[in-house]
Amino acid sequence: MLFIIQWIRSLIFALQMYLAMTVIAFFGAPISFLRTDYAYLVVRFFCNYVTWSASWIIGLKTEIRGEPPSGEMLIAAKHQSFLDVIMIVSKTPKPKFIMKSSLTLMPIIGFYARRIGCIPVKRGKRSEAIKTMLSAVQDGNATPGQLIIYPQGTRVAPGDKVPYKVGAAALYEALGQPCMPVACNVGLFWGRLGIFKKPGTATIEFLPPIMPGLDRETFLSKLEETIEKGSNDLMAEVLDSNAQL
């Protein structure tokens, strides 16, 4: 019975979230045309609405640990579900993503992605994809802010192993900026696919930045170790206190 109730709550949450996305995006579009800063405000308002509505509709609270970045910086984050995107954007001053070019063709996501300076990249052979990404980043570097990349290249369910891709190291080397790792446990509550969401407290943690100057291999090894340990620690906190998850 509890499962059925939670599933119904999850369905209600999903429906109202996408309705809110449509309404907020529609009314926010005119001011977002005027200035990029207004587009950031609209996007952040939606993200904050999602976390607020999740807390009372499905009983899913959110927690931010660590110090979010304030200046220009590369952010490399663990990606478990849409929720970690929401949480990172809600606390990052000027976020812009490395994202699949197909997403920019979507009416709402595409419009706001272009307004805040997200960088579309076509997927293909690894060497070609990296060259395309670096070229796109250089073209988009006129838009200051925090460039966000998911070094595993996809959403990864808790416990699954997916290698870290060299693209993150190539960006780190090309930009010459600090890279802030971000760990999370959100996949325990909000999965990669499906409607069902679990109650609890989902956490992301902004970890100490990795300073520029490391070679690619050393950087990628340190990045993976830092993010995986941080995420495993966050997940262990939840699992140790809630065996049902």
Ranges and model annotations:
Residues I4, I130-L245:
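Non-catalytic C-terminal accessory region of glycerolipid acyltransferases
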Residues G59-K61, K94, R115, P144, ...:
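A generic structural signal for alpha->beta connector loops
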